[in-house]
Amino acid sequence: MPLSRLIIQQFRNIKACDIALSPGFNFLIGPNGSGKTSVLEAIYLLGHGRSFKSALTGRVIQNECDQLFVYGRFLNSDQFELPIGINKQRDGTTEVKIGGQSGQKLAQLAQVLPLQLIHPEGFDLLTDGPKHRRAFIDWGVFHTEPAFYDAWGRFKRLNKQRNALLKSAKSYQELSYWDKEMARLAELISQWRADYVAQMQSKAEQLCQEFLPEFHIQLKYYRGWEKETPYQQILEENFERDQTLGYTVSGPNKADLRIKVNNTPVEDVLSRGQLKLMVCALRLAQGQHLTEKTGKQCVYLIDDFASELDSQRRKRLADCLKQTGAQVFVSSITENQISDMRDDSGRLFHVEQGVIEQG
């Protein structure tokens, strides 16, 4: 469902704004520091309950204010509007409302508003540690496998309890009770992840090939322990090592999506512009897979669209985004940089010192 309306109050340098949106492309144009990225950040907060730029709530609440508020309305296929909103206070208190009902969970926000973010720091998906690629996989599993969220939460709690017990356990038998349930959850989570990667892999590799035809892209899922060995056996065999280290070494919390081009890690081969194109291809593949599996459309947030991309690559990305039929928010310094995306159905907003006006 596309956002039809967005209200932001006391968020960074935006005192207040209330804008009607296009179900297609929405362009935010303004100089650096004007507040255009803050609009994207507010939408991300509405879908995730947190900022993509700061983990500290106090940093996104406007100076001398005690709280922020972001509110959106969605228009479904029956033209019915669903309101959602999030209020965050400086003391860390968060209130979520969906359809006028308060006390909703952040995970419910994510279900209502599936978001894909492409921003200048997004290279970490490819160049940093496995946690970023686990999050990439888990976004897809969360939106396509209803039981995943609770199962993953239970596994993490059990893993934390097991790590605490490792410090005092005299023998493996003291952990066997926890390990039985941990193993069941680990195998389940791993299978969901493997199935998801297998389902979206061909689309991801196809888009990567379209964006980077000079390279052969390879994606391979690693579940976090030896492929042919049951997880409960791994836990028992590694008990002494885990106890020495003080934590459980193997498991789904160590999973990774290994991405190579021409059999070489991507960070050793691709330029920054090529890395950005690959991130775009992977995010678009996820969005397309979501639509095919569930009928839902992603909302795409693209910050600093032109950075790292020449005009030819910008056009290639613009064409692919248009083909999705999804709602897209794009920030850019100049209108010229987004000329390949513009048409009569899109809306353009000028942003200056936190004030947003339709162009």
Swiss-Prot record:
Residue ranges of the TM segments: none
GO biological process: DNA replication; DNA synthesis involved in DNA repair; double-strand break repair; SOS response
GO molecular function annotations of the record: ATP binding; single-stranded DNA binding
Statement: the UniProt record of this protein carries the keyword Transport: no
Keywords, comma-separated and alphabetical: ATP-binding, Cytoplasm, DNA damage, DNA repair, DNA replication, DNA-binding, Nucleotide-binding, SOS response
Cellular compartment(s): Cytoplasm
Matching InterPro entries: DNA-binding_RecF (IPR001238), DNA-binding_RecF_CS (IPR018078), P-loop_NTPase (IPR027417), RecF/RecN/SMC_N (IPR003395), RecF_2 (IPR042174)
UniProt binding sites for ATP: G30, P31, N32, G33, S34, G35, K36, T37
The keyword Nucleotide-binding appears for this protein: yes
GO cellular component, one term: cytoplasm
Entry similarity comment: Belongs to the RecF family.
NCBIfam families on file: recf
Role description: The RecF protein is involved in DNA metabolism; it is required for DNA replication and normal SOS inducibility. RecF binds preferentially to single-stranded, linear DNA. It also seems to bind ATP.
Protein name in the entry: DNA replication and repair protein RecF
